[in-house]
Amino acid sequence: SIKENDGKLVVKGVLQRANAKNQNGRVYPMEILQREAKNYEEGFIKQKRALGELDHPDSSVVNLQNVSHNITEMHFEGENLLGTVEILTTPSGNILRELFKNGIKLGISSRGMGSVEAIEEADGKPVMKVGKDFELIAFDFVSNPSTHGAFMYPLSENVDKTQVQEGRTCGSYCKTENIINKIIRGE
């Protein structure tokens, strides 16, 4: 993958999922996630400053000395927000690069600010619905993402048309993604 991308490591996968409870007990409503994805694309991706860090700092500011990657594209496929991420040649980016080269499975997690509202699910368990004031700050690489299936996979920047399934570019991971989505939906 690195050789095919002019020496750049590019990874793709699920960034976030709408209307599904994550491992932190939060649900991101579709309308809020769509709004923030659009704002993030306009304010950060198009300006080539959609930077993120390793791990998941509590800060509402991306610390440049810890930057490891840049989001280059994101789009919705159903309720999944998918994205393309370029790993940078920074000290933290080099750690990511080596982890990927060694076959380590890495996840990604959104960082944001805003309120949450406690609501009750049909089974009586509480869930935290992300409020309308939510603001997306960044996507950070983590070892254990809160969004089910939010893992990144090294892929060639040039999409192999034989790997496109129903307009999706998940390549050989389409089957895995379908299985994960069926489990999440309870099918």
Residue map of PLM features:
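Short conserved beta-strand and strand-loop elements enriched in small hydrophobics
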Residues: 40-62, 108
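Flexible loop/turn segments at secondary-structure boundaries
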Residues: 21-22, 59-62, 69-71, 117-119
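Short glycine-rich, polar/acidic loop-and-turn segments at beta strand-coil junctions
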Residues: 15-19, 54-58, 87
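A short, polar/proline- and glycine-enriched secondary-structure boundary/capping micro-motif
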Residues: 23-25, 63, 93-97
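Short amphipathic alpha-helical segments that mediate assembly, nucleic-acid/protein binding
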Residues: 176-180
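Polar/acidic, low-complexity leader/linker segments enriched in S/T/G and N/D
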Residues: 1-46, 166-175, 185-186
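Short, solvent-exposed loop/turn motifs
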Residues: 27, 60-61, 126-127
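Residue microenvironments linked to proteolytic maturation
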Residues: 10-13, 50-51, 70-173
